[in-house]
Amino acid sequence: MTKKVYVKTFGCQMNEYDSDKMVDVLNAAEGLEKTDTPEDADIILFNTCSVREKAQEKVFSDLGRVRELKEAKPGLLIGVGGCVASQEGASIVSRAPYVDLVFGPQTLHRLPQMIDARRASGRAQVDITFPEIEKFDHLPPARVEGPSAFVSIMEGCSKYCSYCVVPYTRGDEVSRPLDDVLTEVAGLADQGVREVTLLGQNVNAYRGALSAGSADIADFATLIEYVADIPGIERIRYTTSHPKEFTQRLIDTYAKVPKLVSHLHLPVQHGSDRILMAMKRGYTVLEYKSVIRKLRAIRPDLSLSTDMIVGFPGETEDDFDKMMALVHEMSYDTSFSFIYSPRPGTPAANLHDDTPREVKLKRLQHLQATIEENVARISQSMVGKVERILVEGPSRKDPNELSGRTENNRVVNFPAPLASHPRLIGQMIDVKINHAYPHSLRGELLLVSDDASAATH
C-alpha cells in the first residue's frame, strides 16, 4: 500500500513553495504520495509561520489534535517545519514530546535523512541550521499540477525591519545562481507551465551569480528578461518586493517585458513617515509614491496590492489618517492588513505601546472596509471588458465550468463545453466579463476553436 504524507501550510507563498518541495522530496526518496486527509497519512508535517502570534499558537493547537492520531497509529511521524521551527527549535519537542521532526526552511531537503535517523534512534530529530542555498542542490525536479508554478529565486532577508522575525528564522539574503533558476523554469515550461511566480522574501534584492562560482552577478531585472525568453512562458509574476530595492532598471523592465504582468504586490506597511522610520523600513511615503508614479507612467493599468500593519507602537490618530490617505491615493486592489503582533527577539517588541486594542481593531476594520470598497469598484469597472486570462482548470464551484486568472489576479469563472476543457486548460484566452462578485468575476468565452493554438497568442 502506498504511504502518504499530509502537509498543512501556514503563512506566505514561500511556505506554499516549500510545502510542495517537502512532498517532492519525500516522494522521490520514499515514494510517499500527498493526501489531503491527515487520518490517512503516515507522515504529518506542519509548515509554520511566525510572523504573527496567532499563527504560531495555531500550530500548537493543531499539534494537539494530531496527537490523538499518533496514539491510534504508533508508526505515524509528526514534523514541524518552517519559521516557528527555526525560532523555537528543540523547545517544540519539550512542549510537544510526540513531535518527531523539527526542521527549518533551509533544511527541508534533509527530511529523508532525518526520518531515517528518527526511526533508527527512536529520538526526535532537530535540524534548524542555515546551510545557505544548499537545499536547491538536493531537491528533485518539480511535479507540475497546473499551468502556474512558483519558483523560489532566493532565501532570507537582510533588511531587519524592527518588527519582523524573518531574518532570524530564514537567515540573510542568499540568491540562487541565474542558470539554476532558468533551468528550473525551463523544466516547468516543458511540463506545460505558462505562468511563473518568482518568489523571495525580498525578491527584487536578487543578486545571483550567472552560474555556480561565477563572479559575474545578475540583478532581478536581468533575471526577468531571461525568464521571459524561455519558450512556453507567457506570464511572469513575482512576490514579495521591497520599495527600497525598486531600482530604475526594474521599473524600465515593465516597458521592455510585456510578459511581466501589470500587477504588483509592493508592501508599504504604513502611510506615516514617523512610523516607517520606527519600523526601519528605509524609505519615506514620498519615495514609495514616486516608484508607483514611475511604474504607472509605463503601465497606466497597473493594479497594486500591499501589506499594512495597524497599531504599531506609538501609532496616533494622525498616523492612521496618513495611512488612509495613502490607501485612497494609491487605490490598492488588495491589502493584507493586520494588527501589529510583537514578535519575541525583534527590536519593536520592546517599544512602549499605549494604544487600546479596541482602537486598533476599529482602525483595522476601517482600513479593510475601504480596501473592500476599492476591490468592488475595480471589479465592477472590469464588467463589459475583454480580459486575457490563463485557464487554470475546472471551477471550484462548478466543475462543468472553467476558471482562470486575469493579469490583476482576479479569478474568472466561465462556461465552456466539457469536451473543450482539456484543450483550453493551460491556454491564454479572451473572456468578456459579464458580472462582478465580491471575490471573483464571471465571463463568457469569446473564442472556441478545435485548434487549441487558435485560443492563444
From Swiss-Prot:
Its main location: cytoplasm. One of its GO terms (molecular function) is N6-isopentenyladenosine methylthiotransferase activity. Pfam families: Radical_SAM (PF04055), TRAM (PF01938), UPF0004 (PF00919). Its cofactor is [4Fe-4S] cluster. [4Fe-4S] cluster 1 binds at C12, C49, C83. The keyword rRNA-binding does not apply. Keywords: 4Fe-4S, Cytoplasm, Iron, Iron-sulfur, Metal-binding, S-adenosyl-L-methionine, Transferase, tRNA processing. Gene3D superfamilies: Methylthiotransferase, N-terminal domain, tm_1862 like domain. One of its GO terms (cellular component) is cytosol. It catalyses: N(6)-dimethylallyladenosine(37) in tRNA + (sulfur carrier)-SH + AH2 + 2 S-adenosyl-L-methionine = 2-methylsulfanyl-N(6)-dimethylallyladenosine(37) in tRNA + (sulfur carrier)-H + 5'-deoxyadenosine + L-methionine + A + S-adenosyl-L-homocysteine + 2 H(+). Residues 143-377 form the Radical SAM core domain. InterPro entries: Elp3/MiaA/NifB-like_rSAM, Methylthiotransferase, Methylthiotransferase_CS, Methylthiotransferase_N, Methylthiotransferase_N_sf, MiaB_methiolase, rSAM, rSAM_horseshoe. It is found in: Cytoplasm. Binds 2 [4Fe-4S] clusters. One cluster is coordinated with 3 cysteines and an exchangeable S-adenosyl-L-methionine. [4Fe-4S] cluster 2 binds at C157, C161, C164. Residues 380-447 form the TRAM domain. Its EC number is 2.8.4.3. Residues 3-120 form the MTTase N-terminal domain. Monomer. Belongs to the methylthiotransferase family. MiaB subfamily. Catalyzes the methylthiolation of N6-(dimethylallyl)adenosine (i(6)A), leading to the formation of 2-methylthio-N6-(dimethylallyl)adenosine (ms(2)i(6)A) at position 37 in tRNAs that read codons beginning with uridine. HAMAP family: tRNA_metthiotr_MiaB. This is tRNA-2-methylthio-N(6)-dimethylallyladenosine synthase. It comes from Burkholderia vietnamiensis (strain G4 / LMG 22486) (Burkholderia cepacia (strain R1808)).
